[in-house]
Amino acid sequence: MRLDVLIAAWNEAARLPGVLAALAGHPLVARVLVVDDGSTDGTAEVAVAGGAEVLRLGVNGGKTAALARGIAALQGEHVLLLDADLTGLRPEDVTRLAAPVLARRAGASLSLRGNAPGLWRALGVDYLSGERVLPLALLQELAPALPGLPRFGFEVFLNRAMRARGMQVAVVGWPGVASPAKAAKQGLWRGLRADAAMIRDILRCQPPGELLAQIGWLRAQIARQNLACSASAAVVSPMTRPSQTPTPPQPTTNPSP
């Protein structure tokens, strides 16, 4: 079983090559599709040079709209969603994120990056993570609703759908992977405005009570995951138990008369 990779990118020519390098030749990757969301910095050309298929959008419509266009073009059974600006991504990170889903231990997986906000790292989950493995069928089912979402409402909308379906989710640590802050990419004030717009979109998409419920649900998923790991470690196979061969009786000697 292999993955289709979907990446929405807007003006990521500087960082996209590192992401594509981690995917090149990966045995679990069947196809890489980059949706160029109206970039003006040569992102599409960089994607082609990195071996990806490219779907070019003439106007920047935001991440949700770009992903909706990409989902319509995919055909595989499972999809790996990746942000275009990741740094430090390695092939083994891709393998570890895919493993719980491909082994059918979970219905979906999401990453916890090394530079995720401190609160998310303390909780052990980033509910806004853009790096996920999940069934294409779920994304296709949700696709008709995506055009009505805010530009940055995709992740929390997806969380709600997975929670409603009772999906089991695995959280995979990516300590060496980072996603730069918007202020680092766009400058301080533009970055702060972009962060504020993202928060506004998230709250427009899902109310605060639902967001808290999503975090609690994912925390419960982590507890289930940890319990399963502990139970697995506690099982000792009969083939690995130490030998318990009984000690033969020692001969006795009669005392001399």
Q: Where in this protein do the model-derived segments appear?
A:
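Cell-envelope/extracellular polymer assembly enzymes that use nucleotide-activated donors
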Residues: R2-D4, F157
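Short, well-formed alpha-helical segments that are part of the catalytic scaffolds
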Residues: N11-G25
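A conserved acidic beta->alpha catalytic loop
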Residues: D36-A44
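Conserved donor nucleotide-binding strand/loop of the catalytic core
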Residues: A44-A73, L112
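Short aromatic/hydrophobic "clamp" motif used to bind/position activated sugar donors
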Residues: V79
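Conserved donor-nucleotide/metal-binding helix-loop-beta segment in metal-dependent transferases, i.e.
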Residues: P91-L112
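Short beta-strand-to-loop element that shapes/binds the nucleotide-sugar donor at the catalytic cleft/hinge
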Residues: S109-A122
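Hydrophobic helical membrane-anchoring modules
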Residues: L149, A161-P257
